Amino acid sequence: MLNDKIKELITPTAKTLGYKVINVSFIVKPAILKIVIDRFDEKKVNVLDCQVFSKAISAVLDVENIIPGKYFLEVESAGIERSLMDLEDFIKFLGYTIQVKLVAAINENKKYIGVISNIKGQEITLNLQNDSTIAIDYDNIKVAKIVFTDEMFRQITKNY
């Protein structure tokens, strides 16, 4: 798949620059290559980061000519309600509220919202809103993302 090839191609350059490629998606019409990045140093991605990354990746993509014809390159941060793409992301966001959609239902549900309270191997434990917990195998997670909460809002706005 083209998205996977692009991610594989640009990941070494991203790592050298201190970035992690979160997601790559190529839209054929209009031709747009969208790349979502994060920083390894835990700082927030800013406009300058996107500009630096874009210039470096453009050079790599142009040399490899992996995308035929002209296209628009869009680089952005993962954002507040970012997707969790790998087990490393779950570890990084321990204590955060997330929404998960599962491949196979647990207790007849395929969707849960809860706080990541523990990670042991491939097992992720969520504290659910009804004060119960659920253990989910990482391989059973289809999609996961951070949920923007009132507490996050208070943290962001406390210095304003």
Curated annotation (Swiss-Prot):
GO terms for cellular component: cytosol. InterPro entries: Ribosome_maturation_RimP, RimP_C, RimP_C_sf, RimP_N, RimP_N_sf. The keyword Cytoplasm applies. Transmembrane segments: none annotated. One of its GO terms (biological process) is translation. CDD domains: YlxS_C. Keywords: Cytoplasm, Ribosome biogenesis. Pfam families: DUF150_C (PF17384), RimP_N (PF02576). Its main location: cytoplasm. Required for maturation of 30S ribosomal subunits. Belongs to the RimP family. HAMAP family: RimP. This is Ribosome maturation factor RimP. It comes from Orientia tsutsugamushi (strain Boryong) (Rickettsia tsutsugamushi).
